[in-house]
Amino acid sequence: MWMQELWHKEKVIIGMLHLDALPGNPRYSAGDSLDTIIEHARMDLKALINGGVDAVLISNEFSFPYQRKMDFVTVACMARIIGEIKKDITVPFGVDAISDGAATLELARAVDADFCRGTFSGVYVGDGGFYNNDISKLLRRKTELHLSDLKMLYFINPESDINLDTRELVEIAKSTVFKTGADGLCISASAAGQDVNETLIRSVKDACPTIAVLANTGCRPDTIESKLKYADAAVVGTYFKKGGKLQDDDGNNIRVDVNRVKEFMGVVDQFRKG
């Protein structure tokens, strides 16, 4: 599997690097500074790497509410931030321009990301309204951008949205892999930080044994071993932050706590040793 080729290990842990609200986002105020956002990103990156994660996934987590077609300024700011901190990235990294698959691919091209994550296929409805992802256009765009080495991790049950496809998730997973050649499938709960169903992870892995299956939410030291019994990797965001919270009472991004990362990775290392 490509994960072993990229990381030379099994049961990979991908740490989320959540960017602060960016210029043009509702939570960005006139007094905010892009230089400060860059410094915050650098701090979180160092905490994740020093804590021992295997990879980093950079997203515009605080661009609430998310756009189906992202403003150019948001993508441009993400590219600048990643460019500023890239020399400090010593592990494979990915990008997620949330809810905009085309922007995610173009950002990946600009910063030479190893992988990307996104809602690339399917039809969903949620707080942001109705959206239909045209995977045919996205994969053709990927070809145009010469991104044959870029690995794509697909949400098949995105957080906070309802899939209008009434088939069982396992059937959706199988057809997604067959039609798109997905490199990985992300299994989520209903919201960030919520515990993902381990039975669902196992069912998808059994149905798609040659495809990387990732536990995408709710991974903590007391739950990660049971998830990694079936998942090939896990994406961890909320737990790594100070106090295990996504944001403070004012809606601001909370920084990554290196000690929480080390604690978590210690459990994972023991699990890997069997």
Which role does the model predict for each range below?
Residues 1-34, 139, 143-144:
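N-terminal amphipathic alpha-helix/helix-capping segment at the start of soluble metabolic enzymes
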Residues 9-10, 15, 67-95, 133-154, ...:
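Alpha-helix-loop-beta-strand connector modules within alpha/beta enzyme cores
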Residues 13-17, 56-58, 93-96, 116-118, ...:
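Hydrophobic faces of well-ordered beta-strands that scaffold small-molecule active sites
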Residues 15, 48, 56, 116, ...:
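Conserved, mostly hydrophobic/aromatic
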Residues 18-43, 93-100, 154-170, 219-220:
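Active-site mouth loops of central-metabolism enzymes
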Residues 22, 103, 107-184:
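Conserved anion-binding
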Residues 49-77, 123-127, 182-195, 244-249:
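Glycine-rich, proline-tolerant flexible connector loops at the mouths of alpha/beta enzymes
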Residues 95, 100-113, 171-173, 207-209, ...:
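Catalytic cores of alpha/beta
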